């Protein structure tokens, strides 16, 4: 059985650039998996994916021409049903064998060869046979069809085939199919195309057309030499990155300054999907456009033209940019000039928007927010702005008195005003960023301007937090208003659905409270955020489920940071109000877990909790010394009298490790108490006193964390 390398290529019209990378990876993976499942390729087969604007291809090593035959065990029926007392086949067995294609003449010999095996209930007859292995043509036909059906296609096209009658659905019209097993064409067909050994190279620069492959292994090299195509997405991407660095260095030499292209992985992926043979060129625009905020210029060059703007060593935008061209003419001046002409109107538009926007102050735009609908149940952006401002003022007053309250309120009022500017209307990604520029232009303090930009932060996992306290307050207010508002009208995330990004908002609140160690109790924050909604029709207070939601997100975030589920549960189950304390509590729990006494105390705490849960009425942590009769309960009480003040003092100062470690002295008296003392004494007074002693022990053990959660 011969094994050779396999090459499959589907030649198509230009594929969607933002989807190309995933399409290429999915096509090769699905194709190879199907071949492996069919027994045509070993599990160790090497797979190489190729993807360019006009082709999807896969190279798979060690593919067999025919899959090995597979032993098949067909369970027939119990021996008692299939054979009579003399060992002859019953009519039921003969009928079953006939269904398997075994005629009456051959049945006798087959019956004699049937295998008997006990299936745990009875002896059963099995018919063992060999299933003929699929040929490569059969297996590859199914593999290609399955791979195409499984592609993550953003939107399909329906197009007519050359016969003028048939039509097929695919992401783009397909015009060629290559299927080579070594040097042999595999006779498969898909999308109205029969496989061959020919494809087409670069639309303009191929030196040979069509490109003909003698065997599967010369695919990439032959496409590169004859077709002027770098077929590998990864190799083409690396080549573009290399050329970008080289062109930036060349541009820097011409100006006497070190220049670098912007670092944008998504843009690099996109341009890789737009070209088959990259050629990076240097363009420039007029210096006057640099008066526009560089975020605007960079965005318009990236989003509209797919250019890489060049920055100087300080990160400041220069008037030079890099173009990733798909052609390499001897004289590139026409290509460069064309790109410079195309980008100029884009930059002129940005300058026009910037100049026009600055003719009106941010404050004068605020009134316009009352005409913008935020949510049909929560009113306009103007009403939302008023709620955010009220929440920001209250938080600011809690953290920094009247001065911070005024600054936070002012920033909150202006935070959404840039939504009504021309620049943000054209580029929504610049909301907040443009607000900062316009606030500075209006003469507002830097901390107010920074807060206008930063109140959206953190926008995503790993994003930076607001740079100042005013921005932090407004960002908290903005996210809390969203959370409280959406929960109050029943818009709670379910499963994968989270259209208002409430999980992200919750994590933002958690990060700002924890990483800034803000002295803001969570319950009080939620009550503060709910207050401005009192006049909203149909709003229902939802602080309790929202708190559950936030603590749940907190627990998930902590587990992702590497804390164990037990450590997280021990701390979060106590629902600490100051989230800034949580890292210290977790560190304390981890240190406590390393003590030799920890396991016994955790188990004892769990036992105490279970005892107290069974009591109908709440137990007060009150002990009458006169009712302490047993030596063990007296010893436990004395230990608590000594340990509790130490643990409390450490807890109050925030030394949670010391507070928990003080509990180690309780192990011996706790063990003795449970060995020697009957908690549920017949005397009600004794029983109540012992329960009070346990309640006191339970309270002491659970100040920092519920250490019972550490019990296995």
Swiss-Prot record:
One of its GO terms (biological process) is glycyl-tRNA aminoacylation. One of its GO terms (cellular component) is cytosol. It catalyses: tRNA(Gly) + glycine + ATP = glycyl-tRNA(Gly) + AMP + diphosphate. Keywords: Aminoacyl-tRNA synthetase, ATP-binding, Cytoplasm, Ligase, Nucleotide-binding, Protein biosynthesis. The keyword Aminoacyl-tRNA synthetase applies. It holds the Pfam family DALR_1. InterPro entries: DALR_anticod-bd (IPR008909), Gly-tRNA-synth_bsu (IPR015944), Gly-tRNA-synth_heterodimer (IPR006194). Its EC number is 6.1.1.14. The keyword Nucleotide-binding applies. One of its GO terms (molecular function) is glycine-tRNA ligase activity. Its main location: cytoplasm. It is found in: Cytoplasm. NCBIfam families: glyS. Belongs to the class-II aminoacyl-tRNA synthetase family. Tetramer of two alpha and two beta subunits. PANTHER family: GLYCINE--TRNA LIGASE, CHLOROPLASTIC_MITOCHONDRIAL 2, GLYCYL-TRNA SYNTHETASE. HAMAP family: Gly_tRNA_synth_beta. This is Glycine--tRNA ligase beta subunit. It comes from Dechloromonas aromatica (strain RCB). The gene is glyS.
């Amino acid at each position: 059985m011969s094994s050779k390398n396999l090459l499959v290529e589907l030649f198509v019209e230009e594929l969607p650039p933002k989807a190309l990378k995933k399409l290429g990876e999915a096509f090769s993976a699905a194709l190879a998996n199907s071949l492996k499942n069919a027994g045509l390729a070993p599990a160790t087969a090497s797979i190489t994916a190729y993807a360019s604007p006009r082709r999807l291809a896969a190279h798979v090593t060690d593919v067999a021409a025919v899959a090995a035959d597979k032993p098949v065990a067909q369970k027939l029926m119990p021996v008692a049903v299939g054979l009579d007392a003399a060992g002859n086949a019953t009519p039921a067995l003969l009928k079953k064998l006939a269904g398997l294609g075994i005629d009456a003449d051959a049945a006798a010999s087959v019956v004699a060869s049937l295998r008997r095996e006990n299936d745990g209930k009875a002896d059963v007859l099995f018919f063992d046979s060999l299933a003929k292995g699929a040929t490569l043509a059969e297996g590859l036909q199914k593999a290609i069809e399955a791979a195409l059906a499984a592609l993550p296609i953003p939107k399909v096209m329906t197009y007519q085939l050359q016969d003028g009658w048939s039509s097929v659905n695919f992401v783009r019209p397909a015009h060629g199919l290559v299927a080579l097993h070594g040097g042999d064409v595999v006779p498969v067909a898909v999308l109205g195309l029969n496989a061959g050994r020919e494809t087409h190279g670069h639309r303009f620069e191929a030196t040979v057309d069509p490109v003909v492959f003698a065997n599967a292994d010369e695919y990439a090299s032959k496409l590169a030499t004859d077709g002027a195509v770098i077929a590998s997405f990864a190799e083409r991407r690396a080549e573009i990155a290399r050329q970008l660095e080289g062109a930036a260095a060349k541009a820097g030499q011409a100006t006497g300054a070190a220049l670098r292209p912007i670092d944008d992985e998504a843009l690099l992926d996109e341009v890789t999907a737009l070209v088959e043979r990259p050629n990076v060129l240097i363009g420039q625009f007029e210096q006057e456009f640099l008066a526009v905020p560089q975020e605007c210029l960079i965005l318009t060059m990236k989003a509209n033209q797919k250019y890489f703007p060049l920055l100087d060593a300080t990160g400041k935008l220069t008037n030079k940019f890099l173009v990733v061209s798909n052609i390499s003419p001897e004289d590139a001046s026409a290509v460069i000039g064309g790109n410079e002409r195309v980008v100029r109107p884009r930059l002129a538009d940005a300058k026009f928007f910037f100049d026009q926007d600055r003719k009106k102050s941010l404050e004068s735009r605020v009134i316009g927010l009352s005409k913008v609908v935020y949510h049909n149940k929560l009113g306009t952006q103007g009403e939302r702005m008023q709620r955010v401002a009220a929440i920001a003022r209250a938080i600011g007053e809690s953290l920094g008195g009247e001065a911070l309250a005024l600054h936070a309120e002012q920033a909150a009022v202006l935070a959404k005003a840039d939504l009504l500017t021309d620049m943000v209307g054209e580029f929504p990604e610049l909301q907040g960023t443009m607000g900062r520029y316009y606030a500075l232009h209006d003469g507002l303090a830097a901390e107010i301007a920074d807060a206008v930009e930063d109140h959206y932060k953190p926008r995503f996992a790993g994003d930076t937090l607001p740079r100042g306290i005013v921005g932090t307050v407004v960002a908290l207010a903005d996210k809390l208003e969203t959370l409280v508002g959406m929960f109050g009208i029943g818009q709670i995330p379910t499963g994968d659905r989270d259209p208002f990004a409430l999980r992200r908002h919750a994590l933002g609140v958690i990060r700002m409270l924890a990483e800034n160690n803000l002295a803001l109790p969570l319950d009080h924050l939620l009550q503060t955020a709910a207050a401005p909604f009192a006049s909203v029709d149909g709003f229902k207070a939802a602080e309790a489920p929202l708190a559950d939601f936030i603590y749940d997100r907190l627990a998930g975030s902590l587990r992702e940071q590497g804390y164990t589920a037990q450590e997280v549960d021990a701390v979060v189950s106590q629902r600490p109000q100051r989230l800034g304390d949580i890292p210290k509590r977790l560190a304390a729990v981890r240190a406590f877990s390393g003590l030799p006494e920890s396991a016994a105390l955790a188990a004892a705490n769990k036992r105490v909790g279970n005892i107290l849960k069974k009591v109908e009425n709440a137990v007060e942590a009150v002990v009458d010394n006169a009712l302490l009769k047993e030596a063990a309960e007296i010893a436990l009480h004395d230990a608590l009298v000594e340990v509790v003040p130490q643990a409390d003092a450490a807890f109050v100062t925030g030394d949670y490790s010391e507070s928990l470690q003080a509990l180690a002295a309780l192990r011996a008296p706790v063990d003795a108490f449970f060995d020697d003392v009957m908690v549920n004494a017949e005397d009600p007074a004794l029983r109540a006193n012992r329960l009070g002693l346990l309640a006191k022990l339970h309270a002491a053990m659970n100040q920092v964390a519920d250490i019972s959660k550490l019990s296995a």
